[in-house]
Amino acid sequence: MADIQLSKYHVSKDIGFLLEPLQDVLPDYFAPWNRLAKSLPDLVASHKFRDAVKEMPLLDSSKLAGYRQKRLAHLQLVLITSGYLWQEGEGGAVQRLPECVAKPLWNVSNDLGLKPVLTYGDVCLTNCRVKGGDIEVMYNLPGGAGTEWFLKVCGLVELTLGKGAQSVQNVLDGAKANDKAKMTSGLTELTTTIGNMQAALAKMNDNLTPDHFYNVLRPFLGGFGGPASPISGGLIYEGVSDAPVTMIGGSAAQSSAMQLLDNLLGVTHSPDKQAFLDEISNYMIPAHKQLLADLTKMPRKVPQIVAEAKDANLSKAYSGCVAALTQYRTYHIQVVTKYIVTASKSDSPKSLAYKDTGKSDLIPFLKEVRDDTEKMQK
């Protein structure tokens, strides 16, 4: 069996998929990016952000040094893009991105294998810095404390998984060595981790209202292209190409966490649901996407090992872990209902990720994925 080590995929056994601590600003040459990204909320509120972007010089992204600087640059540039596009709301969106943003964003994206659009990997995994065991949000989108809380809670969920990453590694190592005791221990610990992730997600209710998420923050997570998008024809990246580009918006569906747990536990989905999840994975950090792919290639999957072992303790640990993941997904449906479905006051509510791909059946989709998980207990 292939030896899968999380550390080879930019996954830390302390903070999981979050990026290891880095400086919150780029070198002085990139001061215009630093300044605009930091001042985005205030400049958008005063309707001066677009003008400030137009005055920004075209900087040479090849002066960025190393992976972490490029990740930070990508975060800054997609935030600047978001502020520029959505400063006047969905009704006032523009269809062209100035070259001073578009060209370096395109180049940095190519260097990293990322999409040139705001993703979960940017606003959460790069943007949320672990400090003193807590999450510090480096850059905020419009909306003040409510928006910052949303980003922080996303980071807390990821950090909680990160603290349990060793249990994931133990399951993988146990599966490779056919070590039933190690697998049992890993699955038991992972069950606790998933429960803790649900508790972290529940903190969303403390300082974020549905109205704030849906009407203040959500538009700035938007993608472009397609009949449901305010930028229906796609976005033109000036200085790159005159052909409009279509991208889906930032969404927690782009987190690798749930697909990691699915692939580890052997949860499978119907072809149409898997096709959407595969499309979403194209918006993940490439190393994280590769981890998910490598997990699916394991010659002997965890459910098979559990079934063949006929070990009561291992079976109980596996079933408990699947039950915890099922419960997490049930709670996540409640969160989505509160912050998207109810807040939208629409007969066919859509999250932006689903809008941009033409899917309007958000809640049925999530319920089917939850049910796919629950079936693994039988």
UniProtKB/Swiss-Prot annotation:
Heme binds at H332. GO terms for molecular function: heme binding; indoleamine 2,3-dioxygenase activity; metal ion binding; oxygen carrier activity; tryptophan 2,3-dioxygenase activity. The modification Blocked amino end (Ala) is found at A2. Keywords: Heme, Iron, Metal-binding, Oxygen transport, Transport. PROSITE patterns: IDO_1 (PS00876), IDO_2 (PS00877). Serves a reserve supply of oxygen and facilitates the movement of oxygen within muscles. Belongs to the indoleamine 2,3-dioxygenase family. Homodimer. This is Myoglobin. It comes from Haliotis diversicolor. The lineage of its organism: Eukaryota, Metazoa, Spiralia, Lophotrochozoa, Mollusca.
